[in-house]
């Protein structure tokens, strides 16, 4: 799983930070949370949402997802390290000044911002609604050359789709 924060400014409200968990293989957005800070608690809140959404919080899995992040202060905090230990998750941090390591999530945030910044949002709830709508569009309708859409790849439907196309 890749994770990162992205910034949004709402006039009259200040800065908001979007914490996202993206599945590295499929590019599927598993979970996201709009936060007023970028602390370890914001990361663990988003991770809890992702574990629940993916079923990893209740299923018996041999390997929990591994977290890939940059070296931002919330990701190098001892609190996050303890939380990951408690949940049996490994953490890999990209090399400093090498954003390509998290290329997929950087690209996701860029795509989201290009779309959402064109819209008018005046309240945090408006921004949250815009993000939610775009996550749904991105996961279920946006086509990627190599995998179809992220939901198909994440849920394992893409192989059946590829096979059905090859028989035509």
Model regions and ranges:
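Mobile-element integrase/transposase regions
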Residues: 1-22, 45-49, 53-56, 62, ...
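Mobile genetic element proteins and their domesticated derivatives, centered on retroelements
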Residues: 4, 21, 27, 47, ...
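Hydrophobic (often cysteine-bearing) scaffold residues that line and stabilize catalytic clefts
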Residues: 18, 39, 43, 68, ...
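A short acidic/small-residue loop/turn micro-motif
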Residues: 23-24, 34-41
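Acidic/histidine-rich, metal-coordinating catalytic segments
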Residues: 47, 59-77, 95-97, 148-153
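RNase H-like polynucleotidyl transferase catalytic core
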Residues: 64-71, 85-104, 118-122
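C-terminal domain-tail junction helix/linker
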Residues: 78, 85-89, 110-168
